[in-house]
């Protein structure tokens, strides 16, 4: 049996609602996981938008495009609102006979015994668990109570997410333009909705946050490429960008997954997909261990999960850091080198396809 502790249930989904400002670009591999868990059909029935092309550039002459057709795929992935993902997964958990969801429960302390962990709740109750999975986000209580440290730093950028209505059909291409102050990205959504992502210095993002939607519309028109067309902003939110990596993912009877284990620069929208890769790997390793009659909550078994995921997450984090460092520099020789790099990437054929397959988890 599984017990899920959650401070609050996610809000129910209403088809007539405006989109969530928080959007995830769900890769083909993540869709595969959601299908295997039996939740994808319910999520798809709410609201998703397939994207088939991904483009990035700084100079128009140095333009890289990835196309689903190159990999003979029907789509590269789907743009899904976070509230849609959360509601779909929550409903599946609530309906599962082996799962108990405790809403309003909060962890007070955690004590590891020989074979079990005692979870002391703020409401006075104690739960005993053979395996504790910390899937409680970037500021993970489970990680902190387990005494697991993190390697972390703050990027010199913040990120603004803007829900917009488009005068033109948003299409099925997502794109990102690099600028000296930070990337500008476009994520197509359902109907005539889209999401814009604006990376910039924290002070600049705070300035944008203080604007009315009419003022923000003028700023978008001035700072996004002309191909965006006319858009009308309807909602916006912002957050600072922090890179974190837990020094370890596991202890006896404990495993960290997703943002509790690692956060990444959202440049390529890989954060949620890395978390889903963690879940996929942990499920597979636990099932294999049970099938072999091993103690599936033991440190040797859980270390297999850490070995499989930590290096992959580090590679993706480091790749995003290289992009961030390379495209945050406005020196002319650096700009020339990075644009030559983009031109080379566009012509790299097989290498380009391999990079795309890796990003999609294929």
Language model regions located:
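A general structural signal for well-ordered alpha-helical segments in protein cores
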Residues: 27-31, 82-86, 90, 157, ...
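Short beta-strand to alpha-helix junction loop
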Residues: 25-28, 70-91, 203-214, 241
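FAD/FMN-dependent oxidoreductases across multiple families
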Residues: 206-297
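Conserved N-terminal helical subregion
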Residues: 46-145, 153-158
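N-terminal FAD cofactor-binding segment of flavoenzymes
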Residues: 17-58
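Conserved FAD-binding catalytic core of PHBH/FMO-like flavoproteins
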Residues: 34, 124-125, 131-236, 241
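C-terminal helical "tail/cap" subdomain of flavin- and related membrane-associated enzymes
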Residues: 284-362
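Glycine-rich FAD pyrophosphate-binding loop
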Residues: 1-22
């Amino acid at each position: 049996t599984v017990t899920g502790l959650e401070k609050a249930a996610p809000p129910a989904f209403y088809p007539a609602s405006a989109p969530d400002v928080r959007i995830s670009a769900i890769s083909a591999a993540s869709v595969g996981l959601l299908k295997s868990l039996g939740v994808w059909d319910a999520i798809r029935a709410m609201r998703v938008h397939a994207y088939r092309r991904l483009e990035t550039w700084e100079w128009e002459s140095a333009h890289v495009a990835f196309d689903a057709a190159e990999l003979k795929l029907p789509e590269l992935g789907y743009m899904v609102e976070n509230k849609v993902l959360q509601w779909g997964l929550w409903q599946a958990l609530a309906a599962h006979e082996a799962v108990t969801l405790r809403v309003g429960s909060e962890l007070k302390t955690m004590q590891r015994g020989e074979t079990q962990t005692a979870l002391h709740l703020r409401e006075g109750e104690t739960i005993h668990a053979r395996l504790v999975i910390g899937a409680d986000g970037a500021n993970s209580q489970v990680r902190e109570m387990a005494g697991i440290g993190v390697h972390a730093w703050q990027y010199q950028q913040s990120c603004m997410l803007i829900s917009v209505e488009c005068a033109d059909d948003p299409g099925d291409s997502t794109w990102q333009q690099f600028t000296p102050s930070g990337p500008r990205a476009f994520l197509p959504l359902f109907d005539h909705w889209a999401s814009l992502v604006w990376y910039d210095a924290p002070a600049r993002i705070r300035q944008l946050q203080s604007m009315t939607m009419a003022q923000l519309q003028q700023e978008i028109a001035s700072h996004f490429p002309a191909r965006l067309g006319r858009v009308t902003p309807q909602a916006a939110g912002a957050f600072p960008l922090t890179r974190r990596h837990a020094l370890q993912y596991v202890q006896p009877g404990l495993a960290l997954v997703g943002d509790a284990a690692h956060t990444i620069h959202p440049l390529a929208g890989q954060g949620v997909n890395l978390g889903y890769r963690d879940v996929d790997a942990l499920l597979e390793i636990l099932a294999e261990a049970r099938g072999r009659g091993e103690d599936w909550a033991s440190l040797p078994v859980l270390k297999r999960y850490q070995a499989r995921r930590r290096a992959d997450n580090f590679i993706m984090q480091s790749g995003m850091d290289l992009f961030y460092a390379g495209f945050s520099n406005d020196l002319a020789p650096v700009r020339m080198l990075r644009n030559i790099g983009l031109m080379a990437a566009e012509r790299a054929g097989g290498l380009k396809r391999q990079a795309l397959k890796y990003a999609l988890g294929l």
